[in-house]
Every structure is written in structure tokens, then in C-alpha cells.
Curated annotation (Swiss-Prot):
One matching Pfam family: P-loop_SecA
Catalytic activity of the protein: ATP + H2O + cellular proteinSide 1 = ADP + phosphate + cellular proteinSide 2
The name this protein goes by in its record: Protein translocase subunit SecA 2
Family membership: Belongs to the SecA family.
Residue sites binding ATP per the record: Q80, G98, E99, G100, K101, T102, D486
Organism annotation: Listeria welshimeri serovar 6b (strain ATCC 35897 / DSM 20650 / CCUG 15529 / CIP 8149 / NCTC 11857 / SLCC 5334 / V8)
Keyword vocabulary terms for this entry: ATP-binding, Cell membrane, Cytoplasm, Membrane, Nucleotide-binding, Protein transport, Translocase, Translocation, Transport
Biological classification of the source: Bacteria, Bacillati, Bacillota, Bacilli, Bacillales
Transmembrane segments: none
Membrane topology: Peripheral membrane protein
Main localisation: membrane
Amino acid sequence: MKQNFDDRKIVKQYREIARQIVKKEGLYKNMDQDELREQTNYWREKFKTKEMSERDKINIFALAREAASRIIGLDAVVVQLIGALVLGDGKVAEMKTGEGKTLMSLFVMFIEVMRGNRVHLVTANEYLARRDREEIGQVLEYLGISVALNESDLDKDQKKAIYTADVIYGTASEFGFDYLRDNMVRQKEDKVQSGLDFVLIDEADSILIDEARTPLLISDRKEEDLSLYQTANKLVKTMLKDEYEIEEHKRFVWLNDAGIEKAQKFWGVESLYSAEGQAELRITMLLMRAHFLMHKDKDYVVLDDEVLIIDPHTGRALPGRRFNDGLHQAIEAKEEVEVKEESRTLATITIQNYFRMYKKISGMTGTAKTEEEEFRQIYNMDVVVIPTNLRINREDVPDDIFYTKKEKGRAIVYEVSWRYEKGQPTLIGTSSIKSNEWISGLLDAAGIPHQVLNAKNHAQEAEIIAKAGKRGMVTLATNMAGRGTDIKLDPDVHKLGGLAVIGTERHESRRIDLQLMGRSGRRGDPGFSKFMISLEDDLLEQFESKSWEKLSVKLKRKAPRDGKPVNSSKIHAVVVNAQKRLEGANYDIRKDLLSYDEVIDLQRKMVYKERDLLLERNKLGVSSEKILREVAEYAFIHPVDIEQEKLEKYYARQKELLGGTKFPVSFDEVSLMEPAEVVEKIVTWHKKERDKFPIETITAIEKEVYLNLMDQMWVMHLDAMVQLREGIHLRAYGQQDPLVMYQKEGAQLFEKFQADYHFYFAHALLELDPDGLVQG
């Protein structure tokens, strides 16, 4: 891939600095460990009061380079140092697989610690976090830097201990969940995460882009009539194609007029779009999504009567993860397995909004340039392509395009068989378990031994990948094929052409295609890559158009029956265009998710800030008297000439809502007093009751009650926002923008949430009892 002018300029600038670092290798050669640690302490102290110069940076890099050479026997080369300098600028460094990103990370982490920042190193999974912590962590520890591993099974005290380290390794979800859990604690001392200074993200495209479609959620069980899912399943199984509309690439399906009429008759409601029919509409739409948009062995897999999500970008099953907002239950009903309770959201944040809270963020990956616009727009990060240390020696040939999947399958078997006969290892990449198993059947029929890797046997991943570079080995894998791990070639494989990679479908992102190709030709090894695709592949079917249908029919009519690939510039253009459109659609989904989450994000920050102040001060930020006065003023504003009968009902309602059994104002008093006098009497009575408590006791009670009510109301508010989000598109008519409607109604719901917990707090204040603390 060509680098743009800015890339070349940056790389040229940093190449000179990197060469100066290498020239400094004699500077620390004769120092023992204690002397090197003294250097570490010197730099740490210096930058507490002074800015870091370029000369300082060169010396610090040289110090880390010497330590790596001693401890793990690796001397960082110029391109790795260039990459580290790019990371230090808060950019994404695209470095080809096998070029040494792990060693590159050492330098930016070390220099950020010298600047006084606590560093979080984020990896794609716990295995990689543990591996990299062991390898690079020992170098940092040799220099006196504390290093820890953030794992999911740690208790609160262990978490607090690891967050005191200078460098902490872990997964994106674990850091994110720690943040959410910290904002659910009842005491300040129970928080574990201590500041978000600098984060370095490995496999940045996977974490910041691919995982961005799934928000982080902490939830519990939500009571619901689960039988509705089975009932709706009966309806949707009878749906005909002329009863609904579908845009699969946008992941959207809806009922047309015929479908609405059928559903209303089935449910026995006059209108699905009335308040009466909202529950039935929601459950019907969920089952339609499950049947028409979610595909078994592609989006999910059923193992031991359990529905498991398949990560679309890694091909891995995700045990413990569930589709939210009822979709998982809908799929369970579709597959006729046990429908489990839907979860209720207690706390949530998107990957985008979590990482944007860090003061500084950098990323490294083998494939990022194709997503540069998204990195720049969402994260304000440029992508810089780092040159390889050795020339890439892989042969990448144009796609072979076949008319049918059947012809493609025969051609793949032929391609694999002759490479197998000569002993060349071959990696066959598929986009789903379904196609993975189809190709496996073809290879079995041809008598070609092979190993299979997909979400159903992911536990053997390391073992399978370890064998993939052996002479004569054929490996069939979904796109989970070992990100973060090398396929090492047997010595005699080089002369056979290295590892051959055969892609059986173009993926929904060019980036994933490049990742598959990047399995071969690492560190100057020879290699080969080719995609063998057909006009019947899912990518093209998702973007059917009248013009494409006409072209497809015309091409198939003229197709030679010899099974050879067609070399048509028109077809190549259609494939490229379909992939770009799908990339654009997925980007729109992620932008859409972020736009909607930004509404909640603003609200979340306000609530979490108020919680933090409450925990910090250990008392209310405003007096309970002020809150009670505001609520009482709101409750007792009524017309002076109100009719007697209405006043009695009004009084009874307000008494029950505001004060319950201990309401301090009688009906007779209310009927004779001005609203302001009623309010004053309520506040005065509360003050007298409050003064009966020791100050420490009443302060603690008020804080606990307020916090408890705020948390309860926040959970209810999140649920209300989910319901609003689910239904907003169904209610968006004419020129009304669903996002604008969501922002407006979301703001109204937030105002109601704030009013509600203040109202219930005022109620609790009037129920205070010096003997029983808070009644009820």
C-alpha cells in the first residue's frame, strides 16, 4: 500500500531519530541493573518539573533498548523505533504482522511512565495480555517499573492493588467494566480504577472499530413474559416475502401493509402502533430480525442447546455474551431452545466513549489505513504506515471469480490438491462456519487431509495454528485464524513457496481480507495469496440491485461450462463496489450507535459526577432542606379557587406521594393556607425532626438514601432509554429525524429521572423516624 505524503514525511523525520537511538547503544552497555534503575529514577524525577526534549527522548529509548537486549535478547530495529515514536504522538501505527509490534510497545510505555502517566495496555484477549505482560513486563520490571495484569477473576482488593502499578495489561472489556463497576460502588474506598492517563491499544482496528458495535453492559435479570417470544415465533414462521420489507446490509426489516394487517389479526389488536399494541409490535419485530437478519453458523452458533454469538470479525464464539434488547431471546425462540430471561441494564458505555475519556490514546495494528477516516473522526487519531524491516516477499494475485459456488468449490479443491501434493502448507480462509464446513466436506470427498478451525473448536486454536506452517499441512479456518500469533514455517517449506493463503469469499471489510493475506509472507518469508469467489457469495447477494441482476443473468447465460474463472472488469468492479458499500453501511451503524450513545453519555457523566461528589464529601452536595423545599413547592402549587371536592382529592394524593403516614400538614390547614405557607410548615417540621438525630447519623442516612434512590432511578431511566431507542425508528414519520426525536425525548426522560429521585428523596425525608431511622 502506498503511503501518503504526510506518512513519508513523518517516517523520514523519525527514521533519523531512530538511527540516533541505535547509535546510543554503547551509552548504557557497561551499567549494571542498579545503575540502569538509577537512570529510570532520574528521568522520572526530571519530568515532574521539566518538559521532555528530543535529546531526552533519544536517551530514554536507548535505555529501554539496552534492557530489552539483556532480558529478552531482542535489539529493536529502526522501523520498530519509528513505530514507537509514532505511538508517542497519539497516532495509530500500522505495522505489518510479524514485524514486532510487541517490542515496539515497550518504548512508548516506558516513556509515558517517565512522563508521569499511568499506562493501560489493551489487548484483544486475556491470553495475549498474559503473554505480553510476561515478555515485555519483565523488561519494564528490570528497569524498576511496576507491571500488573488486569484479569476478570480478581476480587476488589486485588483490583485495587493492580491499579497502583505503572503499567497494567488487560482487555478492553475488563477496563471498561471496571469503570462501570466503579460508578456503582457505595463507598469511595471501594473504587479500583485510578485515573485514565494513557492507553495503548494492540489490534486497534479490532477493538476500536469491530468491537465498537457492541456496547459494554452490566445487567441483571428482568422479569418478562417469555412465552410471548414463542407465540411471536409462530407468527413470523408463517410470514410470506410479500408481507415484509428488508434491507439486509442495513440490518433492518419491517412490516408492510399486508404484514401489519396479518400481525394485528394474529395478536387481536386494533393497531400495532397504538399504546395497546406496543408490546406485540416490539416482540414481532424482534422475531423478524431473528428469522430474516440473523443467520445460524454465521451470526451465532447453537452448541448444547445454547445460542452463542459469533464475533463477525474474529469468527470466535463469545460465551457469556448475549445480544441485548430481547434479540437473544428471539433467536432462542427461533431455534426452539430454552428462552432465558432478558437482562436489565444497570450500567452501559460504548467502547468509543470509554476510550475517548483517556487523556491520550495510541494504537497499533497490522491493518488500519483502510479505516483512517473513522479513526480520525471518532478518535482524532491519524494512521501512519510503518515500513517493513525486510521486503514483503509474498505473491498476491488477482481474484478468481466463478459463476456459481459449485464451480468455485471444485476450483478450490483443485488449487489445494496440487499444492498439497508438492508439500506446500495451505491456509484456507472462510467467512462463516457454514462455508467452513462446506469446504471441509469437499476436501474430505477429495481425500485431502486437513485440520479445521472455527468457533466450535476454538479451544484447539493455538495447537492448530502451531501446525499450520508444517510441510503438507492444509488448514481450513474462519477469520479467527490466530490474530496475535505467528504461523511459523518449517525450514524446508521456504523453497516450496512458503504458506499459501486461499480466501474463499471477500469479507465485509477489505481490512479483514488484508489480515488473512497477512498470515503469509511474514518477516520476509516467501508466500502466496489469492481469493476464489463466486457470483453467489453472500457479499454480492446482500447488495442485489436490478442492474446487478441483469448483468448476473447475462453473464451466467454466456458462461462457459468448463468451470474456469471469468476475468471481467465489470464483475471485479461490482465486487469492489459491494465491499465498499458494506464497509460504508457498517461505518454508518457504528456512527449511529455513537450518536445515540452520546445522548446517554452526557447524562451518564452528569450522574457519575454527582455520585463522585457524594462519595468524596460523604454527604449531600446540597442541603436536604433545599431539596425538600423545591419538591414541596412543586407539589403544592394549585389554583386558589379550586373546588372543595377537588382539593380533598388533591390533598390526599399529595399527602400519599410526598409524605405518606407522617405528613405534617392537615387537610384543614391546607384548605386555609397559601401554598407558600404549606411549604414552609413542611420544611420547618422536617428541620425539627432532623435535629433529633446526631449530625453524623443523619448525614450518613441522607447520603445512603439519596444514593440508593439515584441508583434505582438511573436503572429505570436506562431501561426507559432502551425502550425509546427501540421504538424511535418505528415512530419516525415524514421529515422527522429519529436521532433528533431521541435527543429531545431522551432529555425529557432525563428531567423526569432527576425529578423522580428528588421527589422520592423528599418522601423519605418526611418518613424519618429517630427510633426506626427511615420508616418503610
